[in-house]
Amino acid sequence: MNKVVLIGRLTKDPELKFTPGTGTAVASFTLAVDRRFKKEGQQEADFIPIVVWGKQAESTANYMSKGKLMGVSGRIQTRSYDAKDGTRRYVTEIVAEEVQFLEWGSSNNNSMANDQFNNGNENGSMQLPDNNDITPIDDGDIPF
């Protein structure tokens, strides 16, 4: 079994590319995942390279940005390639099978949504309409 589940923050904006020929979308990014323990009172993190393919890659690139929290489930994959200097390089990365956006949008969008939810009231409570607009209904008019 090869299964990985991570929750962390993007270290920079995802990089979106398309494969030559088929044009399949592929996004790559690094996820900073906090460790469960602290060293000398400081939180430590691991920086995990992630690759996601297809529509999920496009959505990730379009809606996620540096610092946003996201969940990833997938598998660990290792590969190697020959670098330009002739040396053999080895890469270990997570190939995402599922991504979840746990935070998205800008802080301006979030505050605008909160303003709409709060209906412009400073203390956050919803303003009710005036009673003058309410028409009483006779129970006999209800068809059930």
Swiss-Prot record:
UniProt KW Cell division keyword: no
CC annotations in GO: nucleoid
Domain SSB per the UniProt entry, residue ranges: 1-103
Disordered: region residues: 112-144
Organism: Clostridium acetobutylicum (strain ATCC 824 / DSM 792 / JCM 1419 / IAM 19013 / LMG 5710 / NBRC 13948 / NRRL B-527 / VKM B-1787 / 2291 / W)
Name of the gene encoding the protein in the UniProt record: ssb3
Stored Gene3D superfamilies: Nucleic acid-binding proteins
Residue ranges with Polar residues bias: 112-134
GO molecular function: single-stranded DNA binding
Assembly and interaction partners: Homotetramer.
Keywords carried by this UniProt record: DNA-binding
Name under which the protein is recorded: Single-stranded DNA-binding protein 3
GO BP terms: DNA replication
Cited InterPro entries: NA-bd_OB-fold, Primosome_PriB/ssb, ssDNA-bd
